[in-house]
C-alpha cells in the first residue's frame, strides 16, 4: 500500500502520500490579526498617548500628563451587537494628571475616552451590526533608498531618498555634469554642499575632509560659490534653503534654522519610527559597507595601539566578524564640531574609513558611517545626513549597491494594530490643539482634566476609520475559506499606499523574496492583480512589520539538517543559501547528495551541499491557504491554479456538504482556524448536547457553555449554520471541534461534493466548458443551498402624523392579509412570493389633493376615512421563500433606534435553491463552467455495474488549459471511492504517478483507469473507453436566480427619460449603437422605431401605448423621443440656429409636436364643426318635442 495514515482531528483519517517530515506545524492562521490587535492594546495605545502627551499651554504654566488607561467590559455581547445593529466595543477610561506649575497643584482624574471597537476571537470587528475586517497594508518601509538611472546619452546617474514614517523627504541626485544636488520635501534642487554648510561645516576643506576628494565633491564645490561676502557661508546656505522652502517670504538665517529643525530634527514633526531607524542604521552601518572592499590604511585599536587589520587587506566576512566588536565600539570614530551658526550645534560623531577605489587602484575613497545612533532616536541626526551623502557619493565610485523597491526587505506590513494606532494618533493630535487653547483661555484654578479634554476628534477619527477607510472591509463570508483568506489578505492599496492606475508591472509582479512570505498564485484577476496578495501559510510578521518565513538550520560543522527553526526576513535570507524542503536526507540528517538545488538572492541553481545554510520547513510554505487546498497543484498551470484558488472562496455552503475524497491535508487546519466552527476552549467532558448548545464540564468543575448558531444570515446572504459534533459523555480536549460550521464536515472544510464525473461529450451540450448534470443531483439535494435575505420596514413621524404598522390597509383583499398577525406582521413559517405583504404599514396622506368623491365621503363620514397611503413592505422581485424569523424593535422595549424612528421590523426570508441550468460550477483546478442541461438519470451514461454518471465535462477543457491536476484527481478519487478511504496529497509533496497507479491497481480498477460507458438511452456501449472518476465539484455564488431579469414596466432616468439599467433598478436591456446597425441592416424599420421611441424615451408615446394596450385599442403612432429634444437644445446652446420644420417647411415648436396627435386637444375648426352639430341636434330635438305634443293633442 502506498502512503501512510494520518489522523486529522477526531473525526477523519486520511491516507497521506507526503514523504517530507515536517518539523514545524502550521501557526495559527489568523494570528496576523489577533496578535497585532493584542499588541496594540498592550503597548501600542500607551505609546500613542506618550507620543502626544504631555501637553503644555502657550505660557508653559500648566501641563497635562498621561498616567494610564483601562478598558472596561463591553456594553453588548457579540450576539446583542449583531441583533441591535450596534458595535461590539468597550468603553475606554484614561487617567490624566493636570499640573499647575505656578502653584504646584496636581489634579488627577479619570476621563471617559469613548467606546473603542474590540476584536472578536475570530479576528473580526462588529461595526453597526455588520462583521468587518481590517485588511493589512503592504507599504514602502521608512528608511534610506538608493537608485540609479540612465539618461538619454547613456550616462548613469544616482539618486537617494530618505523616507520617514511621517515628515519631509530628503533627496539627493546627480545631473549630467556630475554635480550632486539635494531636494528638501520635493522643492527645487540646491547643491548638496549648501546643506552641508547649513549643518555647520562651511569650509570647502572641511567638506573634502569629511567626504574625501572625489570628482562629484569637487564639481559641486565649484558650482556652490560664495555669493554674498556680508553673510557667513553657513548663513548664506541657510537663506538659500529657506528661499527654496518658502519662496517669496523674507529670508533670515534664524527663520531658516528653526524651519530646518522643525523639518528634520524635531521628533514631533519628523518620525522615522522604530523600523525607519532600524533600516537607516542597517544601511549606513560601516560593517555592511566595508564588506568586499580593500582597506587603504592600517586599522589600529584606539585603546591598545594594536594593528587590527593591515592596509591592503580585503575585508571579507570573516575579517569583519573578527573585528566586529571594535567596529561597534570606537574604532575610527571622529568627532566633528559644527560652527556656531549651524542648524544643530551638538558635536557630530562619524565613523570614517579609507578604502581603495574599486575602479582605480591608485585612488583612495572615504566611507563615512553614522556611528549607529541609539534605536530610540526617531528623528534624523546630522550624522545620518552626512553618512547618507557619503553612501550616495560612494555609489559613483562603485562602492555600495542600489536598492530594489519591490524587495520584501523594503516593503513592510501595517497590520490592524498599527493602522489603528495611526488613526488614534491623528485624533489625539487634533485634540491636542483643542486642549492647548482651553488651557490658555480658562481660569487656571478651577480647571480639571475633564473640562479641557474634548474626546470628539478622537472618537470621530476611530469611527471614520472603521466606517469608511479603504482598508476596513465588509467581511467576505461566503464560506470559511473566504473568511480566512480575507483575514490574511495584504493590500498595497489604501491611504499611504499605491493607486491602481499608477502601479506598474514591477510592483505587481512576483518577486523572488515572495518565497514563503506571499503567495505567488492567489491574487485577483483584473485591475488589482498583484496589488492584493495573500500571506503564505507559514508567513508571520516580525516586530518591524517585515514578513518572516521559517527555515530549518543546517549545522555547518556536522553538515546535519537540524530541527532548529529560524525565522528570516527577506533581507536576512539574502545572506544565505537555502535548499528545498524535498532535498534527500540520510537517516542522521545529513544531505544524501553532494549537490543540492538551492536559492541564493533569487538565483535557483545547484550548490555543493556543504555550502547550504538553511532548508525549507515545508513544501507548502510557498503558497497561501486557498492554494494549498488544491491537490496536484504541481501539475496545474499557474494561471488556472489562480482561478482555482479564487473560486474556492466563492463556494456556496451546501445543505449537506461532503469533505473531498482527495484532499491536501490542509482542510482540517483551514476549518479549525477560520472562526466559523465552534472550538473547545478547555479540556472537559460533554454533559449536555443538542442542536442549540453544548455544555462541557471542565476538570476544575466549572461549566463551559457553547452556543450553536442555526441558520443565521451571513454577510453574503448565505446560511451560516453550525452542526453539533459531540454527544453527552464525550471527552473533549482544548482545540477540539465541538460543532462544524457552514461548509464543514467532520471537522474539515467541505466546500462541495464528490460526484462521479466523466470526460466525454454528449449531444454537444458541454460545448465551451458547459457542464451536463444528472437529475439525481437536483432530486437528492446534492447541490442545494439555503439563502437568507433580510428585509426591514420602519415607522417614522411624518409632518402629517406618525406612520403605523397595521392590518387595516386601504384597498387590500382579505386574501392578501391571510398570513399577517393582528399587528400586520407576517407570521414565521409563511411561504411568500413576489408582491406578498410582509409588514402592513400606512402613512398619512396630505389633505390637499382630494378628489370630489373623496370630499363627499369626508362630508358624510367625518374624519374616519382620514386618508392614508399603503406603504407596506412587500416581497421584492426574486425574493420568494419561507419566513425564517421576524424581529421587532421598539423604544418601549429599550431598543436604541435612530431619531424619528418609532418601530423597526426585520423579516428574514429563507430560500432553498436547488441547482439549475445557468448556475456556475467549478473544480479546484480553475475548471469552471455553467450548467447547460440537466438530464434524467435514466438517460445518463452508466458504468458496467449500472451506476449512472453524475456529471459530464468536455475533455477539450483540459489540454489547452494545462491543468492536468484535475485528471489525476479524477483517477485517485475513483480509487478512494472504491477503497472507501479519504486521501491527502499535500501540494508539492503529494502522490507521484507511481503512487497514483499503485492505488488504482489496489482499488481493482483497469490499468488505464478508464472504463467502458453505456449510453443510458440506447444501452449501447460508447465507441471508446472513457475517463470516469470522482472529482470534487463546487457550486459557486454566481447563481442564475440572482442574474435572470426581465422588465415590462419600470423606472426611467430623470434626465434622459430612458429606462434605468441593471437588475437592482429593475432596468431595461441596453440597445446600443451596434444593435441599431443590425436592425438597420435587416431593414426592420418598425421594430427599430418602437425600440427608439415607446421602449425608450418617447414620454407621451409610451403613455399612450400603455393605455392602448390596456384598453385593447390599436397602438397610436410614436412621437418625438426625448433625446431628440436634448440634442436640439444642446446644439442651440452651442449657438447654432436649430429649427424643426414640417413637410410644408413651416416651423414647428417642439412642444407642439406631441400635442397635434393628442385625442383630447381640439382645434378651432373642430370647435366650429361641433357647434354646428350641436345646433343641428338641438333643432331636431325641438322638432321632435313639437311633433310629440301634436300627437297627444
From Swiss-Prot:
Its EC number is 2.7.7.6. CDD domains: RNA_pol_B_RPB2 (cd00653). It comes from the Bacteria. The keyword Transcription applies. Residues 1177-1193 have a biased composition (Basic and acidic residues). Residues 1173-1193 are annotated as: Disordered. GO terms for biological process: DNA-templated transcription. Gene3D superfamilies: 2.40.50.100, 2.40.50.150, 3.90.1100.10, DNA-directed RNA polymerase, beta subunit, external 1 domain, DNA-directed RNA polymerase, subunit 2, domain 6, RNA polymerase alpha subunit dimerisation domain, RNA polymerase Rpb2, domain 2. Coiled coil: none annotated. The keyword Nucleotidyltransferase applies. One of its GO terms (cellular component) is DNA-directed RNA polymerase complex. It catalyses: RNA(n) + a ribonucleoside 5'-triphosphate = RNA(n+1) + diphosphate. Pfam families: RNA_pol_Rpb2_1, RNA_pol_Rpb2_2, RNA_pol_Rpb2_3, RNA_pol_Rpb2_45, RNA_pol_Rpb2_6, RNA_pol_Rpb2_7. Keywords: DNA-directed RNA polymerase, Nucleotidyltransferase, Transcription, Transferase. Belongs to the RNA polymerase beta chain family. This is DNA-directed RNA polymerase subunit beta. It comes from Streptococcus thermophilus (strain ATCC BAA-250 / LMG 18311). The gene is rpoB.
Amino acid at each position: 500500500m502506498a502512503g501512510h495514515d494520518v489522523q486529522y482531528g477526531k473525526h477523519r483519517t486520511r491516507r497521506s502520500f507526503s514523504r517530507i517530515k515536517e518539523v514545524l506545524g502550521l501557526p495559527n492562521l489568523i494570528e496576523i490579526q489577533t496578535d497585532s490587535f493584542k499588541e496594540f492594546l498592550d503597548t501600542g495605545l500607551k505609546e500613542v498617548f506618550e507620543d502626544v502627551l504631555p501637553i503644555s499651554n502657550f505660557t508653559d504654566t500648566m501641563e497635562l500628563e498621561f498616567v494610564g488607561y483601562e478598558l472596561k467590559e463591553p456594553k453588548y455581547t457579540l450576539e446583542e451587537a449583531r441583533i441591535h445593529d450596534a458595535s461590539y466595543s468597550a468603553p475606554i477610561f484614561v487617567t490624566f494628571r493636570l499640573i499647575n506649575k505656578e502653584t504646584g497643584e496636581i489634579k488627577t482624574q479619570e476621563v471617559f475616552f469613548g467606546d473603542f471597537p474590540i476584536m472578536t476571537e475570530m479576528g473580526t470587528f462588529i461595526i453597526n451590526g455588520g462583521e468587518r475586517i481590517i485588511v493589512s497594508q503592504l507599504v514602502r518601509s521608512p528608511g534610506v533608498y538608493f537608485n540609479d538611472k540612465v539618461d538619454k546619452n547613456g550616462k548613469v546617474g544616482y539618486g537617494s531618498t530618505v523616507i520617514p514614517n511621517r515628515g519631509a523627504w530628503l533627496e539627493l541626485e546627480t545631473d549630467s555634469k556630475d554635480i550632486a544636488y539635494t531636494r528638501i520635501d520635493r522643492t527645487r534642487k540646491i547643491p548638496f554642499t549648501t546643506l552641508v554648510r547649513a549643518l555647520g561645516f562651511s569650509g570647502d576643506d572641511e567638506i573634502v575632509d569629511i567626504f574625501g576628494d572625489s570628482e562629484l565633491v569637487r564639481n559641486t564645490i565649484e558650482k556652490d560659490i560664495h555669493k554674498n561676502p556680508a553673510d557667513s557661508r553657513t548663513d548664506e546656505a541657510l537663506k538659500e534653503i529657506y528661499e527654496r522652502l518658502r519662496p517669496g517670504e523674507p529670508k533670515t538665517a534664524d527663520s531658516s534654522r528653526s524651519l530646518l529643525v522643525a523639518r528634520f530634527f524635531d521628533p514631533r514633526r519628523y518620525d522615522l519610527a522604530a523600523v525607519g531607524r532600524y533600516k537607516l542604521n542597517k544601511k549606513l552601518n560601516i560593517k555592511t559597507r566595508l564588506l568586499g572592499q580593500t582597506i587603504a590604511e592600517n586599522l589600529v585599536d584606539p585603546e591598545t595601539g594594536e594593528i587590527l587589520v593591515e592596509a591592503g587587506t580585503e575585508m571579507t566576512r570573516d575579517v569583519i566578524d573578527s573585528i566586529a566588536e571594535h567596529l561597534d565600539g570606537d574604532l575610527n570614530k571622529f568627532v566633528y564640531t559644527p560652527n556656531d551658526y549651524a542648524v544643530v550645534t551638538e558635536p557630530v560623531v562619524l565613523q570614517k574609513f579609507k578604502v581603495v577605489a574599486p575602479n582605480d587602484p591608485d585612488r583612495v575613497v572615504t566611507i563615512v558611517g553614522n556611528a549607529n545612533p541609539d534605536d530610540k532616536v526617531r528623528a534624523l541626526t546630522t550624522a545620518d545626513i552626512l553618512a547618507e551623502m557619503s553612501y550616495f557619493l560612494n555609489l559613483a565610485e562603485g562602492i555600495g549597491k542600489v536598492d530594489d523597491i519591490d524587495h520584501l526587505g523594503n516593503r513592510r506590513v501595517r497590520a490592524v494594530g498599527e493602522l489603528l494606532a495611526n488613526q488614534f494618533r491623528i485624533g489625539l493630535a487634533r485634540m491636542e490643539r483643542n486642549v492647548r487653547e482651553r488651557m490658555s483661555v480658562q481660569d487656571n484654578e478651577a480647571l480639571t482634566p475633564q473640562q479641557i479634554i474634548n474626546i470628539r476628534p478622537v472618537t470621530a477619527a476611530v469611527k471614520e476609520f472603521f466606517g469608511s477607510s479603504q482598508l476596513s472591509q465588509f467581511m467576505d463570508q461566503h464560506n470559511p475559506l473566504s473568511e480566512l483568506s480575507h483575514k490574511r489578505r495584504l493590500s498595497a492599496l489604501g491611504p499611504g499606499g499605491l493607486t491602481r492606475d499608477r502601479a506598474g508591472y514591477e510592483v505587481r509582479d512576483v518577486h523572488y523574496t515572495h518565497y514563503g512570505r506571499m503567495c505567488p498564485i492567489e491574487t485577483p484577476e483584473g485591475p488589482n492583480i498583484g496589488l492584493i496578495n495573500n500571506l503564505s501559510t507559514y508567513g508571520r510578521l516580525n516586530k518591524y512589520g517585515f514578513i518572516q518565513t521559517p527555515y530549518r538550520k543546517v549545522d555547518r560543522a556536522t553538515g546535519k539538517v537540524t530541527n532548529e527553526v529560524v525565522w528570516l526576513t527577506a533581507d536576512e535570507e539574502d545572506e544565505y543559501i537555502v535548499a528545498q524542503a524535498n532535498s534527500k536526507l540520510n537517516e542522521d540528517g545529513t544531505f544524501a547528495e553532494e549537490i543540492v538545488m538551492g536559492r541564493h538572492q533569487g538565483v535557483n541553481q545547484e550548490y555543493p551541499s556543504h555550502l547550504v545554510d538553511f532548508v525549507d520547513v515545508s513544501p507548502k510554505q510557498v503558497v497561501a491557504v486557498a492554494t494549498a487546498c488544491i491537490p496536484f497543484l504541481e501539475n496545474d498551470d499557474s494561471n488556472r491554479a489562480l482561478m482555482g484558488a479564487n473560486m474556492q472562496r466563492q463556494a456556496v455552503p451546501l445543505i449537506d456538504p461532503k469533505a473531498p475524497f482527495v484532499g491536501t491535508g490542509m482542510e482540517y487546519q483551514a476549518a479549525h482556524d477560520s472562526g466559523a466552527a465552534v472550538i473547545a476552549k478547555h479540556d472537559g467532558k460533554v454533559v449536555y448536547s443538542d442542536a442549540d448548545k453544548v455544555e462541557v464540564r471542565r476538570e476544575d468543575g466549572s461549566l463551559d457553555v457553547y452556543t450553536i448558531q442555526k441558520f443565521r444570515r451571513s454577510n453574503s446572504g448565505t446560511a451560516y449554520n453550525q452542526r453539533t459534533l459531540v454527544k453527552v459523555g464525550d471527552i473533549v480536549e482544548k482545540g477540539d471541534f465541538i460543532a462544524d460550521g457552514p461548509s464543514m464536515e467532520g471537522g474539515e472544510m467541505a466546500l462541495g461534493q464528490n460526484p462521479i464525473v466523466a470526460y466525454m461529450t454528449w449531444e454537444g451540450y458541454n460545448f465551451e466548458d458547459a457542464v451536463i448534470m444528472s437529475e439525481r443531483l437536483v432530486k437528492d439535494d446534492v447541490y442545494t443551498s439555503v439563502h437568507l435575505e433580510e428585509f426591514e420596514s420602519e415607522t417614522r413621524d411624518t409632518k402629517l402624523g406618525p406612520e403605523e404598522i397595521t392590518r387595516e390597509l386601504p384597498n387590500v383583499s382579505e386574501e392578501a392579509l391571510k398570513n399577517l398577525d393582528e399587528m400586520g406582521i407576517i407570521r414565521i413559517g409563511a411561504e411568500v412570493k413576489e408582491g406578498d405583504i410582509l409588514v402592513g404599514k400606512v402613512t398619512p396622506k396630505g389633505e390637499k389633493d382630494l378628489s370630489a368623491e373623496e370630499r363627499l365621503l369626508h362630508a358624510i363620514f367625518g374624519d374616519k376615512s382620514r386618508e392614508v397611503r399603503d406603504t407596506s413592505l412587500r416581497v421584492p422581485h426574486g425574493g420568494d421563500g419561507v419566513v425564517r424569523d421576524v424581529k421587532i424593535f421598539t423604544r418601549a422595549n429599550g431598543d436604541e433606534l435612530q431619531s424619528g424612528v418609532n418601530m423597526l421590523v426585520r423579516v428574514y426570508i429563507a430560500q432553498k435553491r436547488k441547482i439549475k441550468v445557468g448556475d456556475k460550477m467549478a473544480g479546484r483546478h480553475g475548471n469552471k463552467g455553467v450548467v447547460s442541461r440537466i438530464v434524467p438519470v435514466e438517460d445518463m451514461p452508466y458504468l458496467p455495474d449500472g451506476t449512472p454518471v453524475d456529471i459530464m465535462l468536455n475533455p477539450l477543457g483540459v489540454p489547452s488549459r494545462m491543468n492536468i491536476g484535475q485528471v489525476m484527481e479524477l483517477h485517485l478519487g475513483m480509487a478512494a471511492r472504491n477503497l472507501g478511504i479519504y486521501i491527502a496529497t499535500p501540494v508539492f509533496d503529494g502522490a507521484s504517478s507511481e503512487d497514483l497507479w499503485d492505488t488504482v491497481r489496489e482499488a481493482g480498477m483497469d490499468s488505464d483507469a478508464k472504463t467502458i460507458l453505456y449510453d443510458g438511452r440506447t444501452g449501447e456501449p460508447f465507441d471508446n473507453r472513457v475517463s470516469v472518476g470522482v472529482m470534487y465539484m463546487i457550486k459557486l455564488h454566481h447563481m442564475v436566480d440572482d442574474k435572470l431579469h426581465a422588465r415590462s414596466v419600470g423606472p426611467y432616468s430623470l434626465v434622459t427619460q430612458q429606462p434605468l439599467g441593471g437588475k437592482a433598478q429593475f432596468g431595461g436591456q441596453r440597445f446600443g449603437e451596434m444593435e441599431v446597425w443590425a436592425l438597420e441592416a435587416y431593414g426592420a424599420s418598425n421594430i427599430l422605431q418602437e425600440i427608439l421611441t415607446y421602449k425608450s424615451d418617447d414620454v407621451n408615446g409610451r403613455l399612450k401605448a400603455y393605455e392602448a394596450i390596456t384598453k385593447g385599442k390599436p397602438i397610436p403612432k410614436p412621437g418625438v423621443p426625448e433625446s431628440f429634444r436634448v440634442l436640439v437644445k444642446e446644439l442651440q446652446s452651442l449657438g447654432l440656429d436649430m429649427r424643426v420644420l414640417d413637410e410644408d417647411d413651416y416651423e414647428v415648436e417642439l412642444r407642439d409636436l406631441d400635442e397635434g396627435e393628442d385625442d383630447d386637444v381640439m382645434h378651432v375648426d373642430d370647435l366650429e364643426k361641433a357647434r354646428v352639430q350641436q345646433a343641428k341636434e338641438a333643432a331636431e330635438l325641438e322638432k321632435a318635442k313639437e311633433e310629440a305634443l301634436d300627437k297627444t293633442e
